[in-house]
Amino acid sequence: MKNKLILSTCVVVAMAFSLPSHAQRLIPKQRGMEVVGSVPLIKGEKLFAKDNFGVGVSLIRYLKRENYVFVLAEYEQQNMPYRDYGVKLKDALLHLGYMHPILSDNGKNVFLYGGISALGGYEEINEDKKLLPDRATLLDRSRFVYGGAVHGSVEVFLTDRLLFLVKAQGRLLFGSDVHRFRPVLSAGLRFNL
């Protein structure tokens, strides 16, 4: 009898710890860090073209009702074709933004977010070289850029602290000599502290 009681207690305790606990998800003032990899969407180019990529690191802080604010530092590189030469476009950007939940499932495991951000940074074109290999002069120049972005993301809880993210972003950059509107797709992981 005593052995059965101890065994039953152990089974109940094991089951309690194996069930997911949602108590520590999305609480106000909770912080998180995310790492994302991205690809720019360029008209007429393949989705995963050579030398077109981006990486970003973000710090987030949850507010009330599952919404959050974020600071995102991002580096992006694009290879713009010119004859048989590629002109490199490199951006280092800092975003300050807000995300608001639009939809979620009943278990609060999958979320669809929408948001906005202000951004600023520096854009470098062709490593600041004015002459191209065919001796043509590049009129576009490197400079500071600023603007805003709209964001959409699907966030899936893998564990109570680890999330998988798929994001879409549409940036509007002022001060740039190249593409003012730049859409981007990204995926990554977030760890909530």
Model-based region annotation:
Residues 148-168:
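Surface-exposed extracellular loop regions of Gram-negative outer-membrane beta-barrel proteins
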Residues 58-132, 162, 191-193:
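Gram-negative (and chloroplast) outer-membrane scaffold detector with strong preference
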Residues 22-72, 190-192:
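Short glycine/proline- and aromatic-enriched beta-strand/turn motifs that initiate or cap beta-hairpins
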Residues 32, 95, 181-193:
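Outer-membrane beta-barrel "beta-signal"
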Residues 55-57, 94-98, 150-152, 156, ...:
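Membrane-embedded beta-strands of outer-membrane beta-barrel proteins
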